[in-house]
Amino acid sequence: MAPTGGGTLAAVHPIERLRYVARASGVDQSLLVQETASALGAFGADPAGMVTACRRIVHRHPACGALWWLCGRVLTAGDPMPEAWRAADEIDADRTAVELAHALPDDATACVLGWPDLVGEALPRRGDVEALVVDVLGEGSGLVRRLLAADVEAVDVATQGLGAAAAAADVVVLEASAVGPDAFVGVAGSRAAAAVARHDGRPVWLVAGVGRLVPQRVWDALSGLVDAAAEPWEADDELVPLALVDQVVGPTGPQPVADALKRTDCPIAAELLVDL
């Protein structure tokens, strides 16, 4: 990927691009990383400005593990911009959705919440799988329409049916926006779905793509910001113990949790760990 390559905001000035990224919500992590990498190009000759820009981005999107990963790589690199583009290329080449599509059991019924980026990319590849899509944050209905258009059997489940859907599924497939050493950030309802599945003996798979696993110090800062964003019962995201997860699906396929955590590769940039 070249710094001058096309993108959704290719003709926009980098400063305006950065403002867009900071304001964006409901945008998938891949796009956020690509647009942030491009926007940071405006600060190539301004190290202090780059630090401030990175801090503002991760504080605006604290649940986005891939942005912490990108900004950590940029701020700890000897040559920041080539590192930013390498990170964007790695996100673009992420095989997690492909591996998830391959790994799902034949003719399985999968319970998913909302419209997760990678899960939503994987399911249309599997016409034999039925999806019970819980309409969390009002996003599930859109995924159901997408799946039906791809000839994938899908059921639009109201939020009050979350527990029943988790108990009825062959596998509960959750997606992490960030993963720490002992917990992950998932969409609201993830903890309840995982707990019901565990109680009923259903496997819980956690989907965590490139850049979403972070070390303890970064996790402490990230999870603290997520916790402080809203009252727990009003938040769009929540912290879920990894003890409720059976397998983590990443770019090399499903792994036990302990093995998956070994691919944590987010650098620790001290500049990101202080309050704005």
Regions found by a protein language model. Name each.
Residues T36, L40, V119-L123, L143, ...:
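Buried hydrophobic packing segments
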Residues V136-L276:
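Conserved phosphate- and dinucleotide-binding cores of soluble alpha/beta proteins
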Residues P3-R86:
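Long amphipathic alpha-helical segments
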Residues G120-R146:
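Catalytic core of membrane glycerolipid acyltransferases/transacylases, capturing the structured
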Residues V51-T52, R56-D128:
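Long amphipathic N-terminal alpha/beta scaffold segment
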Residues V112-W115, V134, E175-A176:
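Short His-Asn-centered micro-motif
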Residues F43-G49, G78-D79, D128, D200-P203, ...:
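Short helix-capping/linker segments at secondary-structure and domain boundaries
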